[in-house]
Amino acid sequence: MLSPRRTKFRKQHRGRMKGVATRGNQIAFGRFALQAMEASWITSRQIEAGRRAMTRYARRGGKLWIKIFPDKPITMRPAETRMGSGKGAPEYWVAVVKPGRILYEMSGISETIARAAMRIAAYKMPIKTRFIVANLSKNPTND
């Protein structure tokens, strides 16, 4: 599962997810992509489950890029602990995802296989997603 090798600080504020993704919202490497339609935290386990599902379905064909990284630590307190005595220990890692963010990209396989693989991965995500295809026009005319 994905997690940072080291961080400057062990714990973070929860924060809030306002607006839409302004970065990472366009296809960069592959031909097909899975795009988030809602804002949410996506855990490293969910990212890994989606990756496994897609690679198993594609069967060694094509290439997969994971476009999100879980860099936010989520802390939890032990069960049945009294209030106070500080913030809990980091328990797992999440990626903060806003609407429009590309989660996965694929290429080297047919659209039908890519669509089916992404649908399986989408079931493992806690948000609504959509399948998008890249425009193949490499050099747009400047008219």
Curated annotation (Swiss-Prot):
Its main location: plastid. Keywords: Chloroplast, Plastid, Ribonucleoprotein, Ribosomal protein. GO terms for cellular component: chloroplast; mitochondrial large ribosomal subunit. InterPro entries: Ribosomal_uL16 (IPR047873), Ribosomal_uL16_bact-type (IPR000114), Ribosomal_uL16_CS (IPR020798), Ribosomal_uL16_dom (IPR016180), Ribosomal_uL16_sf (IPR036920). One of its GO terms (biological process) is mitochondrial translation. GO terms for molecular function: rRNA binding; structural constituent of ribosome. It is found in: Plastid, Chloroplast. Part of the 50S ribosomal subunit. HAMAP family: Ribosomal_uL16. PANTHER family: 50S/60S RIBOSOMAL PROTEIN L16, LARGE RIBOSOMAL SUBUNIT PROTEIN UL16M. This is Large ribosomal subunit protein uL16c. It comes from Spirogyra maxima.
